[in-house]
A protein has these predicted regions:
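Intrinsically disordered, low-complexity regions enriched for glutamine and histidine
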Residues: 1-2, 151
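N-terminal pilin/flagellin-like segments and related low-complexity appendage regions
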Residues: 53-273
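Aliphatic-rich helix starts adjacent to a transmembrane/signal segment
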Residues: 3-58, 62-64
Length: 273
């Protein structure tokens, strides 16, 4: 008859110790894998957000200076000083049309008239794009829409000898003193296009809880965000409104290719002043 001998206390302790070591190693491995996966997902989001931001900017910049049928941009008067993109008066908007692309190189305090220093990441560039929407609408439709919305009309003058442009608001469309240009038939008033001013900048937060970004925004963890301030209308008044575009954008630096010889190709890379 064979007797079975149980495990001693020492053997039990050794077994438990080995098990705990294996469990600790497995836990550490799972934790590292989870951390690695989280970092990969974070990197993927950053790459995708950056790609999306570039796509948005690319699409808008391609249309910079598009003013409908009015293609003689070189005939536009160039103001003596750099225009303020925050101004919304029709006269200011019209005088700035020659600057279809306007940039600010790493300003420290944003744009004093519409982008407060607290809402702009210091040292990041600001880009301004001016153009019109490709889609047209009739003067009657513009008159029935928001009164403060700015529109551009391009067409023939009453004499039929000159092609020109007119800039005005939806309120102007209810009369006949501003939008007076014609189609090529000389009798039908030319259609209108929304006039656009887009100001792109990097903000230290995504959703503001107050009038300016603060440490309490975005759940107490402010997310740097690419935002766009756009010419719009509210309550019959022309104004600027801000829209968050892409979260996770911490910096924006822009170089400008300038064609100095008129051959259609950039001859050098420059930064804005």
């Amino acid at each position: 008859m064979h007797h079975q001998r149980g495990m001693t206390l020492v053997e039990w302790m050794v077994s438990i110790t080995i098990g705990l070591v294996l469990l600790a190693g497995l836990t550490a491995l799972i934790a590292r894998q989870s951390s690695t996966q989280a970092e990969l997902e974070k990197s993927s989001r950053q790459i995708e957000n950056g790609r999306y931001a570039m796509q948005l900017l690319n699409e808008d910049i391609q249309l910079a200076g598009y003013y409908g049928e009015f293609s003689n941009v070189s005939a536009l008067a160039v103001p003596g000083t750099l225009p303020d993109p925050c101004l919304t008066a029709v006269s200011d908007l019209e005088s700035a049309m020659a600057f279809s692309v306007q940039g600010y190189d790493s300003p420290a305090t944003g744009l004093s008239t519409c982008i407060a220093a607290a809402n702009h990441v210091s040292g990041t560039d600001i880009l301004v794009v001016r153009r019109v929407e490709p889609a047209t609408l009739t003067i009657a439709a513009a008159a029935a829409a928001a009164g403060g919305q700015v529109y551009l009309q391009s067409g023939l003058t009453a004499s039929g000898l000159e092609f020109s442009k007119k800039l005005g608001t939806g309120a102007d469309a209810s009369g006949t003193s501003v939008f007076t240009l014609f189609n090529k038939d000389g009798t039908t008033l030319a259609s209108l296009r929304k006039f656009l001013v887009h100001i792109y900048f990097v903000s230290p937060c995504s959703v503001m809880s107050g009038a300016a970004c603060s440490g309490s925004d975005d759940g107490g963890k402010p997310i740097p965000t690419l935002k766009m301030m756009a010419l719009s209308a509210s309550g019959g008044t022309t104004t600027m409104s801000t829209t968050p575009l892409v979260e996770g954008i911490e910096n924006m630096q822009i170089d400008y290719g300038i064609d100095t010889t008129g051959d259609g190709a950039p001859d050098g890379q420059f930064v804005a002043t």
